């Protein structure tokens, strides 16, 4: 599969302040996650002349130029079935067609499969072929992914990491940062990181933390300057997961062992 990655400067808190747009296929290509209109992406799109436009999920730093490029290329605009209305609200344009996990989109280099990868967002999908996948905000090469309400679901996120790891890809292509050429190690690291954080959240509650802020302070031993809001969202997602699994009680404000 021919893969072109074009980093696009956006108002994102992802690594490098950019979102990766991708073009898959040397003919009848798919443009994925066109976050903004830039000269570099214009040039790449002009060379590839994509037949399809799609996104991994609807967050603003992934959809900013969807309508522009779908119109400019006269391309088929895709959205996830059952999320078409949310897609239209996020992009300002209705999809031409919808897909479901397991569906495939044809390119000149072969078919691209839609893989269900919720967690960072409910509608999140990856676009996979035999050796790789565009994975959006499921994974990053360095650091971790924010998973928090209202869109995030920690149980779903962990399942998605395991699902992708089972595919044994050679490379995966994230929404932010460099290409990941060691997918198994990276996905294992992200899983371990989340499970370790779950244990620190559980321990904080066991030791008397009750409010989200108290759990946050007890679960993290590093300086959270500039990212405290992101860490707070992640703590909420962990508390929700633990509550659903019966490990503690959490009403959205207070946790009890």
PLM-predicted stretches and their roles:
Residues 116-118, 122-198:
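Metallo-beta-lactamase
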Residues 206-257:
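C-terminal regulatory/interaction regions
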Residues 1-45, 125-141:
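Conserved beta-strand hairpin/beta-sheet module of binuclear metal-dependent hydrolase folds
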Residues 191-208, 234:
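Positively charged, polyanion-binding regions of nucleic-acid-associated proteins
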Residues 24, 33, 57, 99, ...:
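Divalent metal-coordination and catalytic microenvironments
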Residues 10-17, 34-108:
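Active-site HxH/HxHxD metal-binding segment of metal-dependent hydrolases
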Residues 30-32, 54, 113, 132-134, ...:
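Residue-level marker for buried hydrophobic side chains located in beta-strands
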Residues 6, 23, 102-129:
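Core dinuclear metal-dependent hydrolase active-site scaffold
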């Amino acid at each position: 599969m021919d893969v072109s990655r074009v980093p696009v400067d956006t108002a994102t808190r992802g690594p490098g302040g950019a979102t990766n747009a991708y073009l898959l296929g040397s003919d009848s290509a798919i443009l994925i996650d066109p976050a903004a209109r830039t000269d570099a992406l214009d040039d790449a799109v002009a060379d590839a002349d994509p037949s399809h436009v799609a996104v991994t999920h609807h967050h603003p730093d992934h959809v900013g130029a969807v309508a522009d490029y779908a119109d400019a290329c006269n391309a088929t605009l895709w959205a996830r079935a059952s999320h078409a209305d949310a897609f239209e609200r996020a992009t300002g344009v209705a999809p031409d067609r919808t897909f479901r996990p397991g569906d495939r989109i044809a390119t000149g280099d072969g078919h691209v499969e839609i893989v269900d990868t919720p967690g960072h967002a409910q509608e999140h999908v990856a676009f996979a072929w035999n050796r790789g996948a565009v994975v959006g905000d499921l994974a990053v090469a360095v650091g971790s992914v924010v998973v928090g309400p209202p869109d995030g679901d920690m149980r779903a996120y962990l399942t998605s990491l395991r699902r992708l790891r089972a595919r044994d890809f050679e490379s995966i292509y994230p929404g932010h940062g460099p290409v990941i050429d060691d997918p198994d190690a990276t996905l294992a690291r992200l899983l371990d990181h989340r499970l370790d954080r779950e244990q620190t959240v559980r321990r904080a509650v066991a030791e008397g933390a009750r409010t989200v802020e108290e759990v946050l302070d007890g679960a993290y031993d590093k300086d959270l300057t500039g990212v405290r809001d992101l860490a707070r969202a992640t703590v909420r997602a962990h508390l929700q997961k633990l509550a659903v699994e019966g490990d503690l009680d959490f009403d959205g404000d207070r946790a009890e062992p």
